[in-house]
């Protein structure tokens, strides 16, 4: 697939160790290969690029890949949307409304969030489900961007172990960001609802839109520490 200008390698990437060969878990609508790096059974799966126009999350995911991510990683789940610079996939479906959840509905809550013809109708969603089957994680970290920076965990603190709570709170304090339990509006067919239905812990990391590459690079090392801590402990739903 053509290289995205956004993902041109900064010079310092040249010294990074070459990542292990990826495992293909599917193809996009346009036939782009959807790769899972570091494929193994693990406590954590990291995903970037669910929404193609959220370039900050995609860039940070590729930084993680180049630096060596402690957990299995899909750096860009929606390469077609990234190339087209749009939120949706090539069929104009919001992949974060296309997951098979109890609350999935064919009726969009907003024209911006088209859910697709059926749950998991999109090949990118099917690739994500294949990655889940391969990794068997208990926690998912999804990298997005929004008008402000925060980490959303759709579970109260009491449902997390002391270790997992500490990992998130330490990172939030170090990065100066807020922890939230909800984005504030209904999201049927989204990853949070999927996580609740499947007894998974889902962390959605919203990066402020418009952050420079340098600002995103400054987040890399603290985020690698968070990922190592999340991968070091298995979440058990109450």
Pin down the residues of each PLM region.
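Short, electropositive, low-hydrophobicity segments enriched in small/polar residues
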Residues: 35, 52-56, 61, 85, ...
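Conserved beta-strand scaffold positions in the cores of enzyme catalytic domains, especially
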Residues: 22, 36, 73, 140, ...
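Active-site beta-strand termini and strand-to-loop segments that position acidic
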Residues: 37-41, 196
């Amino acid at each position: 697939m053509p290289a995205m200008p956004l993902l041109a390698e900064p010079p310092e990437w040249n010294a990074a160790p070459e990542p292990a060969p990826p495992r293909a878990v599917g193809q996009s609508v346009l036939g782009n290969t959807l790769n899972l790096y570091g494929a193994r059974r693990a406590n954590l799966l990291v995903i970037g690029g669910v929404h193609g126009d959220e370039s900050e999350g995609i860039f940070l995911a590729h930084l993680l890949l180049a630096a060596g991510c402690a957990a299995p990683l899909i750096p860009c789940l929606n390469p077609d949307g990234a190339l087209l610079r749009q939120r949706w996939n090539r069929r104009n479906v919001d992949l974060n409304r296309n997951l098979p959840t109890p609350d999935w509905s064919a009726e969009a809550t907003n024209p911006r969030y088209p859910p697709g013809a059926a749950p998991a109708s999109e090949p990118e969603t099917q690739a994500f489900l294949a990655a889940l089957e391969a990794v068997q994680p208990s926690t998912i970290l999804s990298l997005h961007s929004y008008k402000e920076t925060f980490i959303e965990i759709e579970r109260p603190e009491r449902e997390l172990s002391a270790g997992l709570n500490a990992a998130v709170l330490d990172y939030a304090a170090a990065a100066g960001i807020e922890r939230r339990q909800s984005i504030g509006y209904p999201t049927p067919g989204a990853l949070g609802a999927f996580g609740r239905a499947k007894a998974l812990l889902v962390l959605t990391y919203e990066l402020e839109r418009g952050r420079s590459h340098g600002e995103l690079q400054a987040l890399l090392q603290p985020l690698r520490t968070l990922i190592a801590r999340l991968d070091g402990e298995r979440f058990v739903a109450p």
